Amino acid sequence: MGLIDCKAIREEILNDVKSQLAELKGTPRLCIVTIGNDDASKVYVRNKIKTAKELGIDVQHLQLDDDICQEEAEQVIEAICNRSTNHAVMLQLPIPSHLNKDRLLNVIPQHKDVDGLTDLNMGMLVNNRQDAIVPATAQGVYEILRRMNRNDDLSWVNVTVVNRSQLIGKPLQALLTNHNATVTLCHSKSDYDFDGADVVVTGIGHAHSYYSEDFFDGQTIIDCSMNRNEDGHLCGDVNYKDVLTHIRDIDITPVPSGVGILTTACLMLNVVKCYLLQGGE
């Protein structure tokens, strides 16, 4: 019990990606589309490009102006997706508020939707289709749980998820249910506590909203948020140091170097999956 070593899990995932890439005759390509100049997005894109290149995955990054209109943005994304050499396509979020995010995402074909955010991929995930592409953060949470359980079957676990977003809560509920977990999905309007949960997953996006008094012995806490505290330091929803100080029998992810580093690794898994779904060898 204690701090979950997400760095070790990340290395295991990346080694899996390397093994899959070594068996391929061709080279998968990831195409990242960015609209505007969001500072956080620049950091995330840089990390994705760095990780992909280290693995030997081709990467193309296309930066679009923040004043681009909806129609032109859709046309650009469609043109990128129509190129057979682009196997995995992602729209880096957030995008400027005048654009319709859902329309842009759904331009991407299911088999190239490396982020797993199209309506079709979400429906396939809910229906437990093996060719569904799972959003990377949700997959990262699952990778933690299946390694801790040493089994893909999660029928032993009751999970409380505090997030209902398209990126985390909704796909995670479907993914964990597909692996036989019992999942309770909460949000800002819910009246909830964590009593009875074996696993708590948080993603509310508020620095240090949870402390040791919110949790119980024997639980696993997975913090999916990346916030900044009053001093400008990166932190999660949970004050993990306070939790570890007051509860001995508990597992918890750190922030930083927690779920965030698994997200990029799982995205690389999805790049290979996209390539294979298109008949790549």
Q: Model features per residue range: what roles?
A:
Residues M1-G26:
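Positively charged, low-complexity intrinsically disordered leader regions
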Residues T27-N37:
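Short beta-strand segments enriched in small/hydrophobic residues
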Residues G36, Q60-Q70, S188-K189:
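Short beta->alpha junction loops
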Residues S41-I49, A132-C224, N229, H233-I250:
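Glycine-rich phosphate/diphosphate-binding loop of Rossmann-like nucleotide-binding domains
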Residues E72-S84:
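Short, well-structured alpha-helical segments in soluble
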Residues M90-L154, H208:
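Anion-binding alpha/beta catalytic cores of soluble intermediary-metabolism enzymes, centered on
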Residues L104-G123, D223-Q278:
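Rossmann-fold NAD(P)-binding glycine/threonine-rich loop
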